[in-house]
Amino acid sequence: RQVKFPRTEEITKILENEAKEGEQPIAEIDKGGEDAETDRSKRHKGTRGHIDYRGKTYLAPLTTVGNLPFRRICKGFGVDITCSEMAIATNLLQGQHTEWALLKRHPCEDLFGIQLAGNRSDILGRAAEIVSRECETDFIDLNMGCPIDMAYNNGGGSALMGHPKKISRIVRTMHYVTDCDVTVKFRTGINKNDNVAHTLIPQFEEWGAALGTLHGRSRQQRYTKLADWEYIAQCKKTTNRMPL
């Protein structure tokens, strides 16, 4: 099956011209003028901005744990927002059935998101664009927290924390190509004693992120030691409108 990705092609061209014209605010890029926005709204029925995340319990995405049966159990215990396990953008574009199965949503999941992982804005843009078209999802989440070697050594997951310019391209691309919210999940940083999340959080919002989820450990810590709740509180103070 051959699929077209018109929005990804549009934003890729815009970003390629940035070196000459300078970075534009995401709102300006996304609207493209009143006429363009009117045309776009006719072609796509969007859901962006309809979720009030504040005061809700969020079952954060976690590979091999947050599968559909587990999420159903958690919904029974009162969780408000659920999210799929991490899906690799490249695998989705290759049409791998096992990867697409991760995106299945149960009817009880009234607020549901899909998490994507990758390291290239064009690949993640295409994946986000087709997921936005083909799947029932309220938001699409970017994985910047996975610490496993397979993801990290390929430049994805928590490795992105060391490349702010790449994050900018990815988040802005995903925001442009979808009509639903784009959210981000990330860690404190890569190394234990080198926290960088607080410097990135204000930029996430500028780039179009609607929600941030912070895992209070570095990539180096993986899942060991206690989360740094003091640093989480510090990061919370850096947000403006974006819930953390």
Label the model's feature ranges:
Residues 1-244:
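Flavin-dependent oxidoreductase catalytic cores
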